[in-house]
C-alpha cells in the first residue's frame, strides 16, 4: 500500500499526518464537482435575486479604478462583477446572451438558472443521475414554452395607437431608476423606435437611434430630438449661434492646403520666402472657402481640425463651421440630412450637400458646455434621445434603462405576442409542467416537478422584494389561477389591489420570456453534465 503521507509530531509530541500533495489538491470529480458548480451558480443568482421586479434594489459596483456604477440592470451587474469560479463566469455569459438577443430579462434568466440548479442539488442528494435530471428539465422546458404560446395575447403594433407599446415599455422601465417618470421615458422610447422602424421588414436599426446625456437638469427634461446632437460647438465664438435652412458640406478631408504625398522639405531662406508661403496658404484657404460657398453651402462640418487663420477666414466669409466631429456622428449627420460625405475637396458639389431646417448651438446653465443640435432634417429616420440628470451615474443608468425599453419595443415589432408579468406567466407554466409531470411514467417526472418549483422562484422573489410573505402570496396566486382559470394573475408588487396583470398593464414580450426559459435550461443542462475539473499541469493521481 502506497504511503498516504508523512507522520509528524507537534511541539507537545502529539502525532499528526501530513497527507501527500494535500496543499496542491485542487481537482474535483463526480458529485463533489457538481456540488461546487451548483454552489457557485447559486451565489451569483442569490446576489441578483434582490434586484428583481419594480421594488428590486440597486447594486453599487466599484471597478479597479475606483469608478462607481449604481445599477439594477442584470447584465451590467454581472459584467462588472469580479468572479473567479468558471461556472460563475458561465452565469455572466448567460446574462450577456439574454442581453444581446432580447435586451431585457437579464436578471430573471440568472435567478431562474440558479433556482433550477438548487432544485437539481436536492435531486442529486436523492440519488437521481444528473443525465436523468437534465433530460427531465429539457422535457419540462418544452412543455413550458408550448404553454407560453397558448396563454399569449397579441397586441396591435400601430403608429396611430401606441398605447400597448407604451405599456410594455413601462413594465421594463418600472424597475429602473427612471421609474418616477417612466411614462414619459416609455413614450420617448416608443416614438424613437417607430420613427426609425422598417415596418416592411419588421426590423429596427439601432444605429439610427443615438442616446446622448448631459449632467444638469432633471430626468423629466429628457426629450426626443428628430435629428442629431453633436457634443461640439461652432469653431469661432463670433459665428452665428443659429443657422436656418442649413445646406451642409460634410467634409472628411483636412481643411488645409494640399501637401505632397512623398517626403518633402521646404527651404525658407528669407523674409520674402516666408511671406510668399504665408500668402500662398491664405490664398489656398480663401479658394477652398470660395469653393464651399459656390456650391450653395452655408455650414461646413469637418471631421478634422483647421488652424486659427482658417477659422478667422471662415468668420470673415460668413461661413459657420464645426471642427473635430467624430466618425459615427459624421455618418449620422449624413444619414439625417441626406448629404454625402466628401473625402476630397475637389469632389464637393451642390448635389452632395445635406439639408437641415435648423442648426443651433445650445448652452447649459452657468457652465461653458455647449452642444450642436441639427433638426428638421431631410430624412427624419435618424433620432437622438437627449437625457438630462443630476449626476453622471443617473444619466448612465437612464441610458441602460432606455436601451432595455428600446429592445423590448423592437421585439414587439418583430413578434407582437405578449404574456403577462408579475410572475403570472411563470406560475401558469409551473402549473402546466406539474400536470404534465403526473403523466410521465419515468424517473424524469421528479425533474419536471423540480422545474415547476424552480419557475415559482421568480414570483416568490417578486413578492419578497415587495415586502410580502413570499410563500403565502405565492400559494394564494397559484390557487386563484387554478380556480379562476386565469393565467394573467400574478404578484401585486405595487399594491394596487388587484392581482390581474392584464388590468395593471404589466406586459412582457413572449419571445423574451421564451428565451429566458430556453437559455436557463440549456445552461443548467451543460452544468449538470460536467463531472470533472482539470487544470493544466495536474497529475493523474
UniProtKB/Swiss-Prot annotation:
This is T-complex protein 1 subunit epsilon. GO terms for molecular function: ATP binding; ATP hydrolysis activity; ATP-dependent protein folding chaperone; G-protein beta-subunit binding; unfolded protein binding. It comes from the Eukaryota. Signal peptide: none annotated. ATP binds at residues 53, 106-107, 422. Belongs to the TCP-1 chaperonin family. There is a cross-link at residues 20, 210, 214, 265, 275, 279, 392 (Glycyl lysine isopeptide (Lys-Gly) (interchain with G-Cter in SUMO2)). InterPro entries: Chap_CCT_epsi, Chaperone_TCP-1, Chaperonin_TCP-1_CS, Cpn60/GroEL/TCP-1, GroEL-like_apical_dom_sf, GROEL-like_equatorial_sf, TCP-1-like_intermed_sf, TCP-1_chaperonin. GO terms for biological process: positive regulation of telomere maintenance via telomerase; protein stabilization. Component of the chaperonin-containing T-complex (TRiC), a hexadecamer composed of two identical back-to-back stacked rings enclosing a protein folding chamber. Each ring is made up of eight different subunits: TCP1/CCT1, CCT2, CCT3, CCT4, CCT5, CCT6A/CCT6, CCT7, CCT8. Interacts with PACRG. Interacts with DNAAF4. Interacts with DLEC1. Interacts with SPMAP2. One of its GO terms (cellular component) is centrosome. The modification Phosphoserine is found at residues 26, 346, 539. ADP binds at residues 53, 105-107, 175, 422, 492, 508, 513. Disulfide bonds: none annotated. The keyword Nucleotide-binding applies. It catalyses: ATP + H2O = ADP + phosphate + H(+). Keywords: Acetylation, ATP-binding, Chaperone, Cytoplasm, Cytoskeleton, Hydrolase, Isopeptide bond, Magnesium, Metal-binding, Nucleotide-binding, Phosphoprotein, Ubl conjugation. Gene3D superfamilies: GroEL (3.50.7.10), GroEL-like equatorial domain (1.10.560.10), TCP-1-like chaperonin intermediate domain (3.30.260.10). The modification N-acetylalanine is found at residue 2. Ubiquitinated by the DCX(DCAF12) complex specifically recognizes the diglutamate (Glu-Glu) at the C-terminus, leading to its degradation. The gene is CCT5.
